[in-house]
Curated annotation (Swiss-Prot):
Pathway: Secondary metabolite biosynthesis; terpenoid biosynthesis. This is Cytochrome P450 monooxygenase prhN. It comes from Penicillium brasilianum. It is a single-pass membrane protein. Cytochrome P450 monooxygenase; part of the gene cluster that mediates the biosynthesis of paraherquonin, a meroterpenoid with a unique, highly congested hexacyclic molecular architecture. The first step of the pathway is the synthesis of 3,5-dimethylorsellinic acid (DMOA) by the polyketide synthase prhL. Heme binds at residue 443. The gene is prhN. One of its GO terms (molecular function) is monooxygenase activity. PROSITE patterns: CYTOCHROME_P450. One of its GO terms (cellular component) is membrane. It is found in: Membrane. Its cofactor is heme. The lineage of its organism: Eukaryota, Fungi, Dikarya, Ascomycota, Pezizomycotina. Glycans are attached at residues 165, 474.
Length: 502
């Protein structure tokens, strides 16, 4: 039929209209897998597309969510900027935590186009989840103690270049400077001395990590059937592909040079040179094949996006609270004078841990790989995008007295509780706080991220004073369901004389 319609130019227009008509009919009559769940923010009667409803979600997502749970306590469908999602009540967290059929990896693949060239760093094919998790748990986390001293030196140099040594109050670019600090603490550990000292590698990773989420979001605006074609012609997508290919060339060149050097040393009867970085650790792992360049970009992407938001918001919160900064400085000095930086020292930074956990606002998301039926009969259809609501983190006055008030001591005091003490740590997860995910869906890199955050924040607080240029300015902003740092808020800093050298 298609050949009859399109072989004759005179019929092309009517053929196109017929195809569009068939597609619209299918869209209208074929129910989505989760369509029996009530949609709380669909199109209004005079709206043809979902554009306006998505705009309303981005502007008022939090209010829509809270009002909807008052009517539909177990959950509902919410039209988001990423398409319709099932929003579950936190009451299902115990079943959610161990449900393998709710798969965050597939959700990630759905939103990040990981099947397309340029986006493959988050693909399970190029970076298998088992290899990624094994790398973090067996190599990265155990290296926290050994890598801390060098990270301190690099942080000091990065702060001097971005925040300067001026003892006068001056404004900083919070977002870009925190990105620099995040790269500073991770890049040498991930890729070793050859690439971490390369300006080309630094520029590539900054560019790629910054562009990836923006380009992925823009590609989602196109119909799914057209995305593979659009990916090949959109300049921003082309740029991502070029960066991935360049990363492969650079990583492979380092690996080849190391292999040649090691072979030469062995032939001369010398001990092979020992490397302690991600490029070496990757080669020591067993498991399915893994693209080493994609692994490196995935590590950097995950670390930067996990760190920048939380560290930026913490700095904004502390800039409003000089008395809390003084308490944190006293804690840092007491801990550092008693022992060197490492996991044991970071554990003792209880107040800092509490401040970071109080600041944290992240959410776990998944996709159902099969129909999932919970114990009360609630069904999640296969193919549904699912989000576990964390609104109780800000609304639960039983667990969190005065829940809307920032209390830097909240989780430090909770540590002393015989019933809730175990869930009070930054890296802990529970029904009441899912900042790093929950159960089998928890972030495997949370211990490494927490250590890096505490090391960076210690360096900042001992060496700089903080304040907001305009104390009346909001330090957070809502975007859809998420509470984001307000990067338009102007932060000022000045160099101070540290009580001790870290």
């Amino acid at each position: 039929m298609l050949s009859i319609l399109f072989d004759d130019p005179a019929r092309t227009s009517s053929g196109a209209l017929l195809i569009v008509g068939i597609l619209l009919l299918r869209w209208a009559l074929w129910p989505a897998p989760s369509s029996h769940w009530p949609l709380v923010n669909g199109k209004r009667w005079f709206e043809i597309t979902t554009t306006k409803s998505k705009d309303r979600f981005v502007a008022n997502g939090k209010d829509i969510l809270l009002s909807s749970f008052k009517r539909l306590s177990k959950g509902f469908r919410l039209g988001t900027d990423n398409g319709p999602m099932i929003i579950l009540s936190p009451e299902y967290v115990d079943e959610f935590r161990s449900e393998d059929r709710l798969c965050p990896v597939k959700f990630q693949a759905e939103l990040a186009h990981t099947h397309l060239p340029g986006f493959e760093i988050l693909s399970d094919k190029h970076v298998p989840k088992s290899v990624f998790t094994d790398f973090i748990l067996r190599k990265l986390t155990p290296a926290i103690d050994s890598t801390a001293p060098a990270s301190v030196t690099r942080l000091r140099e990065a702060l001097e270049s971005t925040w300067t040594n001026s003892s006068e109050w001056h404004q900083i670019d919070l977002h870009s400077s925190v990105q620099v600090l995040s790269h500073t603490t991770t890049s040498p550990i991930f890729v070793g001395p050859e690439l971490s000292s390369s300006k080309a590698w630094e520029e590539l990773t900054y560019r790629y990590v910054g562009n990836f989420p923006v380009v992925a979001c823009s590609l989602r605006l196109w119909p799914k059937f057209s995305q593979r074609f659009v990916n090949m012609i959109l300049p921003s997508c082309t740029s991502l592909r070029k960066d991935v290919n360049q990363a492969r060339q650079m990583v492979n060149e380092v690996l080849q040079k190391r292999a040649a050097s090691q072979a030469a040393r062995i032939s001369q009867g010398l001990e092979p040179e020992k490397f302690s970085d991600g490029l070496q650790w990757w080669q020591e792992l067993s498991g399915p094949p893994c693209d080493p360049a994609c692994l490196q970009l995935a590590l950097i992407f995950s670390a930067v996006h996990s760190t920048v938001d939380l560290l930026s918001q913490t700095i904004l919160n502390l800039a409003e609270r000089p008395e809390l900064v003084d308490e944190l400085r006293q804690e840092i000095i007491a801990v550092r004078e008693s022992q060197p930086w490492g996991k044991a020292a970071f554990y003792k930074l209880g107040l800092m841990d509490s401040v970071l956990k109080e600041t944290q606002r992240l959410k776990p998301v998944s996709i159902a790989t099969e129909d999932v039926t919970f114990s009360d009969g609630l069904v999640i259809p296969k193919g549904s995008l699912v989000m576990m609501s964390c609104h109780n983190m800000r609304e639960d006055s039983v667990t969190y007295p005065n829940p809307l008030e920032f209390d830097g001591h909240r989780f430090r005091k909770m540590r002393e509780s015989p019933t809730n003490g175990a869930m009070a740590h930054l890296v802990s997860s529970s029904q009441h706080h899912m900042g790093f995910g929950i159960g089998t869906h928890s972030c495997p890199g949370r211990f490494f991220i927490a250590a890096g955050l505490k090391l960076t924040l210690s360096q900042i607080l001992l060496n700089y004073d903080l304040r907001l240029s305009d104390p009346s300015e909001n330090v957070t902003q809502n975007q859809g369901l998420f509470l984001m740092p307000n990067f338009k808020a102007k932060v000022e800093v000045r160099r101070r004389e540290p009580e001790i050298e870290l």
